[in-house]
Each structure stands twice: as C-alpha cells, then as structure tokens.
A protein has these predicted regions:
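Amphipathic alpha-helical hairpins
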Residues: 1-160
Length: 160
C-alpha cells in the first residue's frame, strides 16, 4: 500500500470478506444460544449483515472497483474463538454469556473498521462511500448496543 486510496481499498476488501464470513458463521451461533431475545437479535443482525454486503458492493461501485474480499485474519480468529465456545460451552446461561461476549468482540472489530473506512472515504472525497459507510457504522453500533442491553438485563445476572 502506497496511498490512502490503497489502504481504503484493502480495508474495504477486508470488511467485505469479514461480512461474508460472518453470514456463514452466524447461523451456528443462533442455533447454539438458548435465550430468546438474543436469538432474535442475532437473527435480525444476520439479515442486516446480508444487507451490509449489498451496501459494501455499492461502496466498491462508487469508487469504480469490483467488489472482492481479501482474507481477514482478525475475523477468522474471532470466528474460531466463537466456534470454540459453541463446542466447549456446557451450561446454557454461561454459554449464552460467552457467546454474547464473542459477538460483541466481532461488533467492536466492525465498528473500528467502519469508523476508519468512513473517515478515509471523507478524506479521499468519496462522498457516496462516506454516506454508505456511515449507515453501516450506525447499524453496527446499534447492534452492539442491543447485545449490550441483552447482556446486562438478561444474560449476565443469571450467569453468576
């Protein structure tokens, strides 16, 4: 990478890969959780994530590039960690708590990436990309807030 535009495109490919990987991994998480509100929130976010992939394709188009992913080691690690929780978790309440924590780790990663991409788009004068990325960033923040609320009000107290 030699320019900010290069870094922007590389990171865009990274999150495109990540969102596609998340859509493949999330159904297993949904199946593994037993809390109804958490299950619903994750199902809603899966639908939202599929929409975000389409939005990312529009971002690529807005900068004159073809949508493509580049392997994201960070998301692979977070997914692997989540799979470990699914396989090793025994108590339903503790498993729900650990899985919501893993899901929030993914959300925090996405928030960091989309925040960076949005600001780079602004710096590069890519107004359409900036607006589209702002929309995704807002969705990720809302998803994280919803998970946080469920964790605080329903999951963490019984997990003691």
């Amino acid at each position: 990478m030699k320019t900010l535009a290069d870094a922007f495109e590389h990171t865009l490919q990274d999150v495109y890969y990540a969102e596609n990987a998340i859509t493949k991994a999330l159904p297993k998480v949904i199946e593994a959780v037993s809390n109804g509100d958490l299950k619903t929130a994750l199902k809603d976010h899966l639908t939202e994530t599929k929409g975000q992939i389409k939005t990312l394709e529009a971002v690529f188009k807005s900068i004159g590039k073809k949508a493509s992913g580049e392997k994201c080691d960070a998301i692979e690690g977070l997914i692997k960690e989540t799979q470990g929780i699914i396989e090793e978790g025994e108590g339903a309440v503790a498993k729900n708590a650990a899985l919501i924590g893993a899901c929030q780790a993914v959300e925090h990663y996405e928030i960091a990436r989309y925040g960076t991409l949005r600001e780079w788009a602004k710096a590069l004068g890519e107004d359409e990309a900036h607006d589209l990325l702002t929309g995704i960033l807002d969705q990720e923040k809302a998803a994280n807030s919803k998970l946080n609320h469920i964790a605080i009000t329903e999951i963490n107290k019984p997990a003691k």
